C-alpha cells in the first residue's frame, strides 16, 4: 500500500487539514490519499516530497504547517502544595482517574509507578519512536504496549527486551512522578494523585524538514504539532475503552502562533476540554525573564525594535502578529546597515533577502490568518 509507512517515513511532508465532515476536501487540498483522521474536524495529510527538501515557497496556508514544541522547565514544580490539596474532606488521591502524559516517555520500571500489589500504574504506552508494523498500531506508526505487556516485562530479568521503551531525558518520568508517583513515607514524597492510572505517549522528534523550516538547530529536540494531536487522540481512545475520566497533561510548549487560541492544537484541546470527564492541563509561566515576546501599539510613524541574536547562532524564527484589517510593513536592517526595504504584508507572499556581510539569508513570509495579519521571519547562516 502506498501510504503504509507515510507517517513514519522522512519521504513525506506532514500537514494539518481542517474539514467539515467531508474528508475529500483534505485530500483535494493537499493532493494526497494518505490521510490520518483525528476527529470530525481535523486530519493529518501526508504529502510525498517527490525530490523536494523543504516547504519553502510551497504556498501552504499557515495553520496547516505543524508548529514545533519544546520541553518546558521543571524547576518550579517541586513546591506544588500537595498537602493543601489533600486537606479537609476532599480526599483527592486520584482514585479511578487516568492521567494522559504527552512527553518524553517514562521509566516504567521505576517503583513510583507500581501499585502496592506490584501491578503497573501504566494502562497503555505508545512509543512513537519505536518503529513497528503499521497495521498493528492504532495510528499507523510507533509501537503500542499494553498494561499486560508492561507487567510481563516487569516480571522478567530483562524488561527492556520485552518493552524496549526508555525515557532518555527523564523529563517525562519526572513529571509523571510529580503527578502520580507513589507516596514514600521515608522520604516524605508523594505525587499529587498517587492512586491515578497513567496513559503514556512518548513523542518522536519532529522531522528534519520541519526543524529546518523553523530554523531549529538539529542538536536540539523539538516535537511536531501533528504528533501531539495524534497523542491526544490516542489518549482519548484508550480512556474511552477503559471508561475512565481522563486528565490530559502536556509538559511542552511553543512561542509560535498568535496566542489567541486559533491554532489547530489549541482548538482541538479546547474542544476536548469541553467534554464531561475530560480535563486538559498545560504548562505556563516559564518565560517571564526570557524576553521572548514583545508587544506594542504601532502608530502612523515608524517604530524601531532591536532583536538581539547570539553570535554563531544556527538561525532563528520570529513572528509578528497584528489585528486585521489593520496593515503594517516591516523593514529589516542588519548590524552592518544593509536593509531589506519596505515589505508590505498581504493575503500571502514571500521575500528572500541575503545579508552579505553577516552571511545570513532572511526569509519573510506574510499571511492573513482568521482575524489577524501575520509576518513570519526566518534567518539562517549562509556558507
Language-model features: locations:
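Autoinhibitory propeptides
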Residues: 2-98, 105-121
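Subtilisin-like serine protease catalytic core
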Residues: 87-224, 244, 325-326
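Catalytic metal-binding/acid-base residues of hydrolase active sites
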Residues: 105-107, 253-255, 285-289
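Short acidic, glycine-rich surface-loop motifs adjacent to enzyme active sites
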Residues: 232-260, 283
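Acidic, Ser/Thr/Pro-rich low-complexity intrinsically disordered segments
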Residues: 264, 311-313, 321-349
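Catalytic-core regions built around general acid/base machinery
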Residues: 264-277
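Solvent-exposed, flexible loop/coil segments flanking beta-strands in beta-rich domains
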Residues: 279-325
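Conserved small/polar residues in nucleotide/adenosyl-binding loops
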Residues: 375-382
Amino acid at each position: 500500500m502506498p501510504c503504509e509507512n507515510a507517517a513514519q517515513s522522512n519521504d513525506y511532508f506532514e500537514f494539518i487539514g481542517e474539514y467539515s465532515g467531508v474528508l475529500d476536501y483534505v485530500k483535494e487540498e493537499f493532493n494526497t490519499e494518505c490521510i490520518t483522521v483525528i476527529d470530525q474536524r481535523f486530519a493529518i495529510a501526508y504529502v510525498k516530497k517527490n525530490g523536494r527538501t523543504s516547504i519553502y515557497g510551497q504556498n501552504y496556508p499557515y495553520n496547516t504547517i505543524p508548529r514545533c514544541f519544546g520541553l518546558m522547565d521543571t524547576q518550579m514544580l517541586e513546591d506544588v502544595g500537595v498537602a493543601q490539596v489533600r486537606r479537609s474532606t476532599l480526599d483527592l488521591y486520584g482514585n479511578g482517574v487516568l492521567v494522559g502524559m504527552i512527553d518524553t516517555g517514562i521509566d516504567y520500571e521505576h517503583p513510583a509507578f507500581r501499585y502496592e500489589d506490584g501491578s503497573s500504574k501504566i494502562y497503555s504506552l505508545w512509543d512513537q519512536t519505536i518503529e513497528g508494523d503499521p497495521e498493528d498500531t492504532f495510528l499507523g506508526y510507533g509501537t503500542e504496549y499494553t498494561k499486560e505487556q508492561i507487567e510481563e516485562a516487569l516480571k522478567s530479568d530483562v524488561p527492556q527486551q520485552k518493552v524496549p521503551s526508555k525515557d532518555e531525558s527523564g523529563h517525562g518520568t519526572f513529571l509523571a512522578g510529580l503527578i502520580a508517583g507513589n507516596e514514600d513515607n521515608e522520604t516524605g514524597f508523594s505525587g499529587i494523585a498517587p492512586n491515578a492510572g497513567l496513559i503514556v505517549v512518548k513523542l518522536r522528534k519532529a522531522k528534519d524538514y520541519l526543524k529546518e523550516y523553523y530554523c531549529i538547530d538539529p542538536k536540539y529536540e523539538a516535537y511536531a504539532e501533528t504528533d501531539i494531536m495524534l497523542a491526544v487522540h490516542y489518549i482519548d481512545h484508550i480512556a474511552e475503552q477503559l471508561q475512565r475520566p481522563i486528565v490530559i497533561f502536556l509538559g511542552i510548549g511553543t512561542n509560535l502562533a498568535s496566542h489567541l487560541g486559533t491554532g489547530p492544537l489549541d482548538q482541538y484541546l479546547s474542544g476536548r476540554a469541553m467534554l464531561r470527564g475530560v480535563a486538559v492541563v498545560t504548562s505556563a509561566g516559564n518565560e517571564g525573564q526570557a524576553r521572548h515576546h514583545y508587544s506594542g501599539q504601532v502608530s502612523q510613524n515608524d517604530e524601531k525594535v532591536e532583536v538581539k541574536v547570539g553570535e554563531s547562532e544556527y538561525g532563528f524564527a520570529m513572528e509578528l502578529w497584528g489585528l486585521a484589517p489593520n496593515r503594517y510593513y516591516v523593514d529589516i536592517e542588519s548590524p552592518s546597515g544593509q536593509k531589506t526595504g519596505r515589505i508590505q504584508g498581504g493575503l500571502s507572499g514571500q521575500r528572500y533577502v541575503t545579508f552579505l556581510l553577516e552571511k545570513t539569508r532572511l526569509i519573510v513570509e506574510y499571511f492573513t490568518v482568521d482575524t489577524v495579519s501575520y509576518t513570519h521571519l526566518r534567518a539562517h547562516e549562509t556558507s
